[in-house]
């Protein structure tokens, strides 16, 4: 039995906020300790994770990404309600939220584990490095000036290539349906631990993606006279400089989702989702 449950909602989506209130009321009626907070309040979320046994999210995939970063390095399962549009990671419709929660509280469902990456940002000037978890993707890209940058890629300490491009994406299987897919990358089965390397609009045609085994270590080194950026999962963003390196490898940690659908659920509707262009602002 779950003794403490957290509810994380998209603060700018009124329907997500309303549903969070209803879920909290349901838990109150069952005598289950619970708390609620905005997905955009990472500094408040992380301390609340201690002793929390289940997280409910109301929002889109972006809400899940922010929630995952607040949970890590703990491994607390997520039961997600889709208040966005596409919802590659979400599980329940708003209409099924209460009944789905009741099923999970009764012991139904299975755990869908997703692989993560660990990223280490290594500044060229020997300043202190920074570490991040990556659930979807890490992107090294040009800044606001519309000029290509050079990104040198090493794989397992061996030089692979230098992209002269808008940037490069290193993606997990979970992130394979996102930016990497838009840049021409493949879609991987969700429980794959493989790593995808995809250039962004490369100059002179070196436009293929590479699927790497899970034990690979990928270094992206920036070489540019212009502004460049690093983005982790689309919401951790920072400027980077020429000579800076981003090193990525498989993490020992996992993100856990509770699923009520069959284990082959991913393929149902996948083609429709990939062809769709109906993203809501609340997916972000």
Swiss-Prot record:
UniProt keyword annotation of Amino-acid biosynthesis present: no
InterPro entries found in the cross-reference section: ATP-NAD_kinase_N, ATP-NAD_kinase_PpnK-typ_C, NAD/diacylglycerol_kinase_sf, NADK
NADP found in the keyword field: yes
Any single Gene Ontology cellular-component annotation: cytoplasm
Subcellular localization, as worded in the UniProt entry: Cytoplasm
Cofactor section: a divalent metal cation
GO molecular function, one term: NAD binding
Any one Pfam family match given in the protein's UniProt record, by short name: NAD_kinase
Function comment: Involved in the regulation of the intracellular balance of NAD and NADP, and is a key enzyme in the biosynthesis of NADP. Catalyzes specifically the phosphorylation on 2'-hydroxyl of the adenosine moiety of NAD to yield NADP.
Name of the protein: NAD kinase
Source organism (scientific name): Dehalococcoides mccartyi (strain ATCC BAA-2100 / JCM 16839 / KCTC 5957 / BAV1)
Encoding gene, per UniProt annotation: nadK
């Amino acid at each position: 039995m779950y003794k403490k449950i957290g509810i994380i909602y998209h603060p700018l989506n009124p329907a997500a906020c309303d549903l969070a209130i209803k879920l909290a009321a349901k838990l109150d009626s069952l005598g289950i300790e619970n708390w609620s907070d905005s997905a955009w309040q990472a500094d408040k979320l992380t301390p609340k994770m201690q002793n929390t046994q289940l997280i409910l999210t109301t929002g889109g995939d972006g809400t899940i990404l922010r929630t995952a970063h607040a949970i890590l390095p703990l491994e607390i399962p997520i039961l997600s309600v889709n208040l966005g549009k596409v919802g590659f990671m979400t599980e329940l419709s708003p209409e099924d939220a209460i009944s789905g929660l009741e099923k999970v509280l009764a012991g139904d469902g299975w755990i869908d584990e997703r692989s993560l990456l660990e990223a280490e940002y290594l500044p060229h000037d020997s300043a202190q490095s920074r570490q991040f978890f990556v659930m979807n993707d890490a992107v090294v890209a040009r800044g606001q000036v519309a000029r290509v940058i050079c990104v040198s890629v090493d794989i397992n300490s061996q030089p692979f290539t230098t992209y002269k491009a808008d940037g490069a994406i290193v993606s997990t299987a979970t992130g394979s349906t996102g930016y990497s897919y838009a840049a021409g990358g493949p879609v991987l089965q969700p429980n794959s631990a493989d790593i995808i390397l995809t250039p962004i609009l490369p100059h002179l045609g070196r436009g293929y993606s590479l699927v790497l085994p899970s034990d690979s270590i990928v270094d992206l080194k920036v070489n540019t006279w212009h502004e460049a950026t690093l983005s982790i999962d689309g919401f951790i963003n920072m400027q980077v400089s020429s000579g800076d390196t981003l090193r990525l490898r498989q993490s020992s940690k996992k993100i856990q989702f509770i699923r009520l659908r069959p284990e082959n659920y991913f393929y149902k509707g996948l083609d429709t989702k990939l062809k769709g262009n109906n993203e809501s602002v609340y997916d972000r």
